[in-house]
């Protein structure tokens, strides 16, 4: 009888474990990404932004180098360059770029008056980021034909429509020299009038894609 009572007490005992509420559970499964930031490092301007939906690690390396590893899940962009930018800069790009799907390597920047965003796309995956842009023509720069086009985007605050200029290289590459003046001349011939450069970087961008990039940038304008 005593043995039966011990078994009954053991089997009827309730053990309570702490539980996570909804917010704690969401935080536990939230993708981890390097916090957004911009500034100077190693004598170069750097810019890093993600929407926080993709596991991603951005790291500034020595000089004009940076490293980015990311997994699919959202939108992100990062890289090194200069602030302010300029119409006429000779940029040397080297390193390793292993982006697939919707990812690209580009010279990326802003003009401030009025606000205009631009991309000189050196490499993209299966998805052309300028697929829905208005074709303006072509230009030959640095040994390849580039398709130049214009599109628009909504500002981050959702209050303005901003123009965006594209120059997409047909003969894709992940390194070499980019003469930005060739592209700005082409864009300005189609109506680009904005001046006063913001930053200008060699960027790795991903959108629901995955990949790895370790890139180095340099301004070789003075060597010409």
From Swiss-Prot:
<dbReference type="InterPro" id="IPR013319">
    <property type="entry name" value="GH11/12"/>
</dbReference>
<dbReference type="InterPro" id="IPR001137">
    <property type="entry name" value="Glyco_hydro_11"/>
</dbReference>
<feature type="glycosylation site" description="N-linked (GlcNAc...) asparagine">
    <location>
        <position position="88"/>
    </location>
</feature>
<dbReference type="InterPro" id="IPR033123">
    <property type="entry name" value="GH11_dom"/>
</dbReference>
<dbReference type="Pfam" id="PF00457">
    <property type="entry name" value="Glyco_hydro_11"/>
</dbReference>
<feature type="active site" description="Proton donor">
    <location>
        <position position="205"/>
    </location>
</feature>
<dbReference type="GO" id="GO:0031176">
    <property type="term" value="F:endo-1,4-beta-xylanase activity"/>
</dbReference>
<feature type="signal peptide">
    <location>
        <begin position="1"/>
        <end position="16"/>
    </location>
</feature>
<feature type="active site" description="Nucleophile">
    <location>
        <position position="117"/>
    </location>
</feature>
<dbReference type="InterPro" id="IPR033119">
    <property type="entry name" value="GH11_AS_2"/>
</dbReference>
<keyword id="KW-0858">Xylan degradation</keyword>
<comment type="similarity">
    <text>Belongs to the glycosyl hydrolase 11 (cellulase G) family.</text>
</comment>
<keyword id="KW-0326">Glycosidase</keyword>
<comment type="function">
    <text>Endo-1,4-beta-xylanase involved in the hydrolysis of xylan, a major structural heterogeneous polysaccharide found in plant biomass representing the second most abundant polysaccharide in the biosphere, after cellulose. May act as an elicitor of plant defense responses in certain plants but does not exhibit any cell death when transiently expressed in N.benthamiana.</text>
</comment>
<feature type="domain" description="GH11">
    <location>
        <begin position="32"/>
        <end position="218"/>
    </location>
</feature>
<keyword id="KW-0624">Polysaccharide degradation</keyword>
<keyword id="KW-0732">Signal</keyword>
<dbReference type="InterPro" id="IPR013320">
    <property type="entry name" value="ConA-like_dom_sf"/>
</dbReference>
<keyword id="KW-0119">Carbohydrate metabolism</keyword>
<protein>
    <recommendedName>
        <fullName>Ethylene-inducing xylanase 5</fullName>
        <ecNumber>3.2.1.8</ecNumber>
    </recommendedName>
</protein>
<keyword id="KW-0325">Glycoprotein</keyword>
<comment type="pathway">
    <text>Glycan degradation; xylan degradation.</text>
</comment>
<dbReference type="GO" id="GO:0045493">
    <property type="term" value="P:xylan catabolic process"/>
</dbReference>
<keyword id="KW-0378">Hydrolase</keyword>
